[in-house]
From Swiss-Prot:
Main location: membrane
This protein's GO CC annotations: plasma membrane
Protein name, as recorded: Elongation factor 4
Domain of life: Bacteria
Domain called tr-type G: residue spans: 5-187
Organism name: Rickettsia bellii (strain OSU 85-389)
GO BP annotations, alphabetical order: positive regulation of translation
Membrane-protein topology: Peripheral membrane protein
């Protein structure tokens, strides 16, 4: 198959739950990619978490063969991309592998914030976009209003939008005809020298790393030696093929085609998404544009609740890293929690998914420390440090200034909840950049500190809008900020696991909230326990757990007063010794609850 005019490479853009994976299932079914008995819901979402949460995490591809009404047979390469903001870079690379997109919008809900972000990326990649309105068989469907929304918000013509119901299969043939007639074929190859885009990769226990590629120029053949331009690694191709969505082995992938190859590569970390693959003997002169390394944005500590599970956790993280190169970890120890790992994630959803996979696939019970972000610390000597662990923060006297990351957030919300959303953004130190109305929905754009987002922003946004607000963000800039390290002391001992870096204006509120929470969680002892929040050497909040009174005189029935006095003196001396050397045991449940504090 080398006639490029019969190839269509396209992706499906949609907000979570707007029916993207269901539409992909119907297209596969219609084109006979799988037998009816092999079909399952969300065929392309392979992980259980993907199916349960209704999200796509890894990019998947499928080649469909479609005989169109014009009598020609077309080869359609569907690229199923992640829709969540944490995986925005993967989305941009998947879109770069295609020439067109289907924009799927739920006709009962309208355009959402995440749809916007991905549509703008598709427009940047010069995609031809075909609007598709899903769920038209539902009573609440408003296709005309949603068409108007698409034109007003995104600015593309929606008058000929395809009306479908992916669940019941209405209009699937119209979608396939629109793909053939409205989306362009790949550009003609200008050279025979191999140039291919690495779209995604995952680990297969039998084949090693499987690499998903889009061939731009030349062709990719079995036994060919190829070079990765970002890492300069050279590999010999062992298998070449494509998915239907079953794996099919072929001898060659031509320009314009999307498929996979294997080359006994051991680690996914060696295969960077967005890299350019070329022939080792005749390399192309220039790499494809847009490659950038995927850097973690959110960090937190993961500790096993039982220290004997440490080796199991270490092995489990290594296995997850095989399949997820954007996830990073290094060992760290805490006096309160023992030995664990400091892990880096692309965002909060990524963190949640890794946590869930560790507990589900590896049966681990973990404590997660408060999430933090990367701060830039300008030292007085001129050195610039990047830190994400509060324990690494240098002495305040040596610091000249600190910078924290800010993000640009787009929020779409029904106008009746707008007031609550605006006050939440203001409370989180947000700066409003834009605000406009489309029909009965408002679109607001805010600049917000990432530090404030990683705690509980998303949960609070959903609760103050009854679940109707949608939220999308991208990194913006680093800006100078008055940051301080908030320490927690129990009985004058610093508890390192509860230390956080916060903005000075929020320090007292968060410190007080933590002290109050810990007061309820730490069991009473025979002495008073002071729980304090501090900035440097200054105490900003304090709570005291009152002592239990142990009645040492209960066994003295009558008798001489000196006997009673002797027992009381002995107890007094014991308490003094306890205050001096006493070690307060903080139960694990207290840590877990205290770390969930958010901004209460």
């Amino acid at each position: 198959m080398n006639n490029q005019k019969y190839i269509r490479n396209f992706s499906i853009i949609a907000h979570i739950d707007h029916g993207k994976s269901t539409l992909a299932d119907r297209l596969i079914e219609y084109c006979g990619g799988l037998q009816a008995r092999e079909m399952s819901q969300q065929v392309l979402d392979s992980m259980d978490i993907e199916k349960e949460r209704g999200i796509t995490i890894k990019a998947q591809t499928v080649r469909l063969v479609y005989k169109a009404k014009d009598g020609n047979t077309y080869y359609l390469n569907l690229m199923d991309t992640p829709g969540h903001v944490d995986f925005a870079y993967e989305v941009s690379r998947s879109l770069a592998a295609c020439e067109g997109s289907l924009l799927v919008v739920d006709s009962t809900q309208g355009v959402e914030a995440q749809t916007l972000a991905n549509v703008y990326q598709a427009i940047e990649n010069d995609h031809e976009i075909v609007p598709v309105l899903n769920k038209i068989d539902l009573p609440a469907s408003e296709p005309d209003q949603v068409k108007q929304q698409i034109e007003d918000i995104i600015g593309i013509d929606a008058s000929e939008a395809v009306l479908i119901s992916a669940k019941s299969g209405i209009g699937i043939d119209l979608v396939l005809e629109a793909i053939v007639n409205k989306l362009p074929p790949p550009k003609e190859s200008s050279t025979d020298i191999l140039k291919a885009l690495l779209v995604d990769s995952w680990y297969d226990p039998y084949l090693g790393v499987v690499i998903l590629v889009r061939v731009i120029d030349g062709s990719l053949r079995k036994n060919m030696k190829v070079k990765m331009m970002a890492t300069n690694s050279v590999y010999t191709i062992e298998n070449v093929g494509y998915f239907t969505p079953k794996k099919h082995i072929s001898d060659v992938l031509h320009a314009g085609e999307i498929g996979f190859f294997t080359a006994s590569i051991k680690q996914v970390a060696d295969c960077k998404v967005g890299d350019t693959i070329t022939d080792e003997k005749k390399p192309c002169k220039q790499a494809l544009p847009g490659f950038k390394p995927n850097l973690p944005v959110v960090f937190c500590g993961l500790y096993p609740t039982d220290s004997s599970e440490f080796e199991h956790l270490k092995d489990s993280l290594a296995k997850l890293r095989l399949n997820d190169a954007s996830f990073e970890y290094e060992m760290e120890s805490s006096s309160a929690l023992g030995v664990g790992f400091r892990c880096g994630f692309l965002g909060l959803l990524h963190l949640e998914i890794i946590q869930e996979r560790l507990s589900r696939e590896f049966d681990l019970d973990l404590i997660t420390t408060a999430p933090s972000v990367v701060y830039k610390i300008h030292m007085r000597e001129g050195e610039v440090l990047e830190i994400h662990n509060p324990a690494d923060l240098p002495d305040l006297q040596k610091i000249d200034s600190m910078e924290e990351p800010w993000i640009k957030a787009t929020i779409m919300v029904p106008d009746e909840f707008l007031g609550a959303v605006l006050s939440l953004c203001t409370e989180k130190r947000g700066i409003q950049l834009d605000h406009n109305y489309i029909a009965n929905r408002a679109k607001v754009v805010y600049k917000l500190p990432l530090n404030e987002i990683v705690y509980d922003f998303y949960d609070r946004l959903k609760s103050c809008s009854k679940g109707y607000a949608s939220f999308e963000w991208q990194m913006d800039t680093y800006e100078p900020s008055e940051l301080v390290k908030l320490g927690i002391l129990v009985n004058s001992e610093v508890v390192d696991a509860l230390s956080t870096i916060v903005h000075r204006s929020r320090a007292e509120q968060r410190g007080r909230a933590l002290c109050v929470r810990l007061k309820d969680l730490i069991p009473r002892q025979q002495i008073d326990i002071a729980i304090q929040a501090s900035i440097g050497s200054r105490i900003i909040a304090r709570e005291t757990i009152k002592a239990l009174r142990k009645d040492v005189l209960s066994k003295c029935y009558g008798g001489d007063i000196t006997r009673k006095r002797k027992l009381l003196e002995k107890q007094k001396a014991g308490k003094k010794r306890m205050r001096q050397y006493g070690n307060i045991e903080i139960p694990q449940s207290a840590f877990i609850a205290a770390l969930k504090i958010g901004d209460e």
